[in-house]
Amino acid sequence: MIKFLNRAFGGIVILTILILITYLGRIPLALGVAAFSYIALHEMDKALKKIDLQLPMKCLYLTNGLIMIAAFINNSDIYIASIVVSVLFLFMYIILTRHYTLYDAFAAAFVMLYVSFLISHILRIKNVSYVWMLYITAWGSDTFAYLVGSLFGKHKMDWMAHISPNKTLEGSIGGIIGATILNIVYCREFGLDNNIREIIVFTIIAAIMSQIGDLIASYIK
């Protein structure tokens, strides 16, 4: 129970910070998201070094900034162009420097996709209510998955035991259901006109992506 409370409290602290920067406006949100993306890149670099993979961090830092700026501008053509330019620049950098292996190149491409591409989409969401729902989903899915899994988890996911041995089917489903309930309550309490089906579909997709992201992070670590 203490472990659960610590985990929930840590999630609430992060959620509070995200709510604050989102409430302050788009520029503080962009700065906060950009800062988070650079921290994530740094953590990915540390994790991958443990398995002898070297990332071209200067290149990834530069392309991350380009993608974040393009996402902030929120023009689809500019955003797509930033992705194409970033990928081309990444592989040209790797080829010309000759300091990296093929495995390093694929790892760098994955990190660009997993960190820069995915995180930048927060800045591309035009309806701020979906940003709030994204935060609620991430926290709610993690918290309820842990709680339900700890209390009722009986069916271990054997196929991912080498990544996360404590994951259970009940926990995964509980995380999705818990996040969905929280988002429905949020939309109803704040008078948002999102229909139930839209809320459920959005939350299920976001919760599944959140859980996959958690598994990827666990695998790398």
Q: Language-model segments: what does each one mean?
A:
Residues S141-S150, S210-K221:
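Short helical (or helix-break) motifs at transmembrane helix termini and adjacent helical loops
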Residues M1-I204:
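Membrane-embedded alpha-helical bundles of polytopic integral membrane proteins
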